[in-house]
Amino acid sequence: MPLLDIEPLDLGPDVKAVGLDLVEDDENREPVRGEDAARIWSRVLPAAAGEEPLVLDFFSHIDRVRDFCDRHQIGYRETTPRSIVIPAPEASALEALLDRFQGETFGARAGGPISAGDDGELERELARRGADAYHPAFPRYFFCAICGFEDGSLVLLSQKLWASEVIRRVRPVLQGLDVEVRLPA
């Protein structure tokens, strides 16, 4: 049975973060990948966001992301020639999107300026700096996330979420799936 370990991360004095690692429950602790991982992550992201609006930020391999979204009729917004913002699609489309692009590093945001429309400054910085652009911006949001699903990793940068709250949010949506959610000792 896969494990979803959720714990606070120490990324420095100015960054509050929660790390989520989806790994096999064995001595090797290899990342869980493939359809099962996409099914789990597609439930975790919206659950972490709760009632806050959620978007995905892609800042590499833009042509492939655009083509996938067009083929699957997933709405998106090209914010710069090198970045695409995807408002969180319905569950099955989100799962397909995460399955297709789990080998890429991309981002997600919830709350904050999303409700007001867009955050052009951050979106330009994402195109230029990738996930590093979230560091100065995350306090404006409910969370900013770095999705490294190939490595079984999701890092939530947030001043509003802590590990126990993330566990409380994700446990119910993962019931019925073969995964154990825990705070490592």
How would you name each of these model-derived features?
Residues 1-185:
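Structured alpha/beta or helical-core interaction and ligand-binding surfaces enriched in interleaved
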